[in-house]
Amino acid sequence: MRVLVTGAAGFIGSHICEQLLAGGHDVVGVDSLDPSAHDGPPGDLDPGVRWEFRDVRDHDLWMGLLPEVDAVCHQAAKVGLGVDLSDAPEYVSNNDLGTATMLAAMHRSGFGGRLVLASSMVVYGEGAYSCARHGTVRPGPRDPADLGAGIFDPRCPLCGGLLDPGTVTEDAPVDPRNVYAATKLHQEHLASAWARETGGAATMLRYHNVYGPRMPRDTPYAGVMSIFASALARGSAPQVFEDGAQRRDFVHVHDVARANLIALEADPVHDGPLNIASGHPCTLLEAARTLAGAHADLTGEVIEPQVVGGYRLGDVRHITADPTAARATIGFTADVHPSDGLATFAGAELREPPKHRP
């Protein structure tokens, strides 16, 4: 199979390319080398990929390449919370316009192959919760007064009591809480519209907290594990917001890449979203301590994470996945347990941020 991978020079995309090549597939890698992420082509790009350094918003790019490929693995996106709302036009243009341009070209060219789309757990907003009195409930955004008082867990919208967190399934209501999350959900809706109108199928992989080699070093767009690892590399304590008890599911990039390969090869093809997670949630403080302990083993430098109590209004408290559907439909189960993956991540090579960030 010949697969077109977008965002192929990026953190996750580069690992997908490697696993596709190892699986015997041909790979066309498309990447715009956005200057907010790259100074130029990274030195670790696989030479077995046919590289096209162009923008996914370029309609002519798609019309030239789609007749040559059997599947599209769409990873290209501007990621993370960004700096502030002034980033919104860039997020919408890169993520939503880029996806719309791709889908329009797929329709016009009569593309009949597979589509696998990188989505994110951020589409859910807060995770699943239960109230002792009212059962399953969906809390709204947390009250700034509670956050300022150090009450970080969300309250029941019916009685105001504190809630117990659970795992979220793919049929949970969606509630994106920031611009990035809104664009990821819009990407899903656009892909679903394409699938309905053309009789195709779009597999949307909702990644949970991805970490691993080639993560970008500390930037406003980096994941939390990159931020922690960057702090340790500087000899600084990782700063853990709130009380550190917020729960996440950390999934290794090798597993995420493998999930894409499995989705591309699945028979029958799966149409719809799937959680891609380790299935072993932990608290943010536990993850930071695991990373700091592994750093100490490697370097002899003992640095304890600091719980700083601060908060960001766009953050959710707990979001952890139920991975059952991915196992049942495409046969994906994560291989890397976070306790092992985070320990090895302490010695992983991170990519340097661009020297001249726009």
Predicted regions located by residue number:
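N-terminal Rossmann-like NAD(P)+-binding domain of SDR-like oxidoreductases, especially those catalyzing
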Residues: 1-207
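Hydrophobic alpha-helical packing elements
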Residues: 12, 61, 183, 224, ...
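C-terminal substrate-binding subdomain of Rossmann-fold SDR/epimerase-dehydratase oxidoreductases
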Residues: 54, 232-358
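Active-site proximal helix/loop that lines the substrate pocket
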Residues: 77-83, 120-123, 209-215, 245, ...
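A conserved pocket-lining segment of Rossmann-fold NAD(P)-dependent short-chain dehydrogenase/reductase
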Residues: 84, 156-178, 202, 206-217, ...
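Hydrophobic alpha-helix immediately C-terminal to the catalytic Tyr-X-X-X-Lys motif of short-chain
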Residues: 186, 190, 194, 224, ...
